[in-house]
Amino acid sequence: MKNRHNGFNIFWDRAGMLLVFAVLFTVCSFTVDGFFSRVNMEGLLLSVSSIGIIACTMLFCLAAGAFDLSVGSVVACAGVVSAVVMNRTGSVAFGIGAGLGLGLLVGLINGVLIARAGINALIATLATMQIVRGFGYIVSDGKAVGITQDSFFVLGNSSFAGLPTPVWICLVCFAVFGFLIERTTFGRNTLALGGNPEAARLAGIPTDRLKTIIFTLQGGIAGLAGIVLASRFTSGQPTVAQGLELDVIAACVLGGVSLTGGVGKMSYVIAGVLIMGTVRNAMNLLNVPTFYQYIASGLILLTAVGFDRLKQRGSGR
């Protein structure tokens, strides 16, 4: 009996939330008109691509026992900065480089504040969230910045093998960061840092440097997501991605990544992202009013945290 119980726990840990997604997807396919259409499937994948891209590195932040609230602001600001630089220089490469550079810089600042200065991740990233959002408004004068380089739009509006390019970018991120978290020393050290910071330090893991690298990566990937979003919208918009950070964290935790650190797999992230995307897509097709969708988003976040607490109790953490 005990072996059966252990076997179920192992199965649930590895694929439980993916099974939940499969059931949810099947139910929606039979009960929601137009859900399983090709156009809607493409729209569903496109709608979760930004969350999926950023969640890949949020996984590392959470696994290390921290989180980053500035990612939504970085997405907006990176798109604006890319648009401004592109328009002034006439170079798509310079624009993309500027957006990525901004994301990496914000991530580095977050990492230094948290790892070196010892400031709590909540306070540090909440501060940079406000600063970066404000900077985006200043650079854009509070308005959308139209992009004049048509070649830039290929990044967000083209397709390959039947899938939109942003979805391919998301899939590549899933593969690369999934390999990093599960197959490399960097990933193992990240999980060790989140599981027991003091033990990780005593084991010789350079914890401060590791945290700095993790947050720098998070900033860079958020910058990439902002550039892709600007390409999709054909403009840099300082108002986009408000609340995106909570969606990303909720997706990770709903999939099984622990808020307290030390636990995380890419399969968890994929499951959480797909579940959130499916629920929202179904609500849109059912014409659920936006006000009620806000309530549903809050309930999803609360459910995610509840799952995390139950897992902690079950594991004795």
List where the protein language model places each region.
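Single transmembrane alpha-helix segments in multi-pass membrane proteins
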Residues: 23-88, 112-119, 256-266, 299
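Cytosolic-side transmembrane-helix boundaries in multi-pass membrane proteins
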Residues: 1-26, 30, 202-209, 281-317
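Inter-helical junctions in multi-pass inner-membrane proteins, predominant
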Residues: 33-43, 136-142, 180-187, 214-251, ...
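Short loop segments and helix-boundary regions at transmembrane helix junctions
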Residues: 2-8, 67, 104-145, 183-185, ...
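Hydrophobic alpha-helical segments embedded in the membrane of multi-pass proteins
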Residues: 48-57, 73-77, 104-108, 171, ...
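Transmembrane alpha-helical segments in multi-pass inner-membrane proteins
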Residues: 216, 222, 232-297
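Transmembrane helix-bundle core of multi-pass membrane transporters
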Residues: 117, 121-184, 210-213, 232-241, ...
